[in-house]
């Protein structure tokens, strides 16, 4: 029996929630010392072996929560931007928003290492300013192109390249220790992160998700032309701006906490849309998919390989082939991007 669109989305969300809980339990159970389910439950409530309690509550739990909120933020941000711009490639990392957040964050790191006054600016604040600055530049440069999705995408790619060059230059102005730390962060890493890193992203997700859900009905209408949505009493331009502001904020906060973890925002929305079998991208489902991707990649990066890899390395290995697939779609006659 074929489910109605919203029922299909609800079923996909339920499956994703169950999968997320299973992955989170596994992530908190594996490490230098494996933990069985009974030990894990006792440790979460602060009882049992002290070493296990410390490993679970002070080391694994903060990292798992950070992976979840960073992945969810990237997933929701990517789903929103792809839906608003009607382009499966229009994710914050491709458009240059993540690059803007990165150059601002690395700039703060570099100036802070030199003892400059800007170095006291918190990295999440710098990342937000950088992300919104990049978005404003994309909008300004894309104004003459009529804000069409494909034109904005090309502008974003060009801007991202320029911002990446600036970031690389900033690395050359830092000392060896600072440059190594920043370079590790730029690959997308959750190593040595804790509750302080997760809190700004968690707040951002808690604020943005209700806004996105409130705009959900209007957002689904964006797959139609503005002339048609006006007849339904929906201001398409205002809804797009509000949603893109939410997308930029989430992408910038996620970047500040985990670095520019590549391809999560790009992949999550498309996986969510296919899983739900609907025309639009369900943002909540995209967030769940993003959380699962980052958590699985982070767990594998610290347990499967002899050395602990940055999570961005694994997401890039998976995401790059998917990007090539999206680029090949027009040649197969499935519609231009």
Give the positions of each predicted feature:
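Alpha-helical transmembrane segments in inner-membrane proteins
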Residues: 1-337
């Amino acid at each position: 029996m074929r489910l109605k669109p919203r029922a299909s989305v609800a079923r996909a969300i339920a499956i994703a929630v169950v999968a997320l809980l299973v992955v989170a339990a596994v992530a908190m159970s594996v490490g230098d010392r494996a933990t069985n389910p009974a030990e894990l439950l006792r440790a979460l409530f602060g009882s049992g072996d002290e070493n296990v309690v410390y490993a679970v509550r002070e080391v694994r739990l903060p990292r798992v929560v950070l992976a979840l909120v960073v992945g969810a933020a990237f997933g929701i941000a990517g789903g929103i931007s792809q839906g608003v711009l009607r382009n499966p490639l229009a994710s914050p990392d491709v458009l240059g928003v993540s690059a803007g957040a990165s150059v601002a964050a690395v700039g703060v790191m570099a100036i802070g290492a030199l003892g400059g006054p800007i170095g006291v600016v918190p990295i999440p604040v710098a990342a937000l300013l950088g992300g919104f600055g990049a978005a404003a530049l994309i909008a300004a440069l894309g104004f003459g192109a009529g804000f069409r999705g494909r034109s904005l995408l090309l502008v974003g790619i060009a801007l991202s390249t320029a911002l990446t060059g600036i970031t690389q230059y900033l690395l050359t102005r830092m000392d060896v220790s600072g440059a190594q730390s920043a370079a590790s962060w730029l690959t997308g890493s959750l190593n040595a992160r804790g509750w302080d890193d997760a809190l700004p992203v968690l707040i951002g997700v808690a604020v943005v998700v209700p806004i996105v859900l409130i705009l959900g009905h209007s957002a689904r209408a964006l797959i139609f032309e503005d002339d048609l949505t006006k007849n339904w009493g929906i201001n398409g331009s205002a809804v797009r701006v509000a949603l893109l502001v939410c997308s930029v904020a989430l992408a910038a906060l996620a970047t500040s906490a985990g670095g520019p973890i590549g391809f999560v925002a790009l992949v999550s929305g498309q996986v969510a849309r296919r899983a739900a079998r609907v025309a639009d991208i369900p943002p909540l489902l995209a967030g769940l998919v993003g959380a699962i991707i980052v958590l699985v990649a982070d767990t594998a990066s610290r347990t499967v390989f002899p050395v602990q890899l940055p999570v961005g390395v694994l997401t890039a290995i998976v995401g790059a082939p998917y990007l090539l697939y999206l680029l090949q779609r027009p040649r197969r006659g499935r519609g231009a991007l």
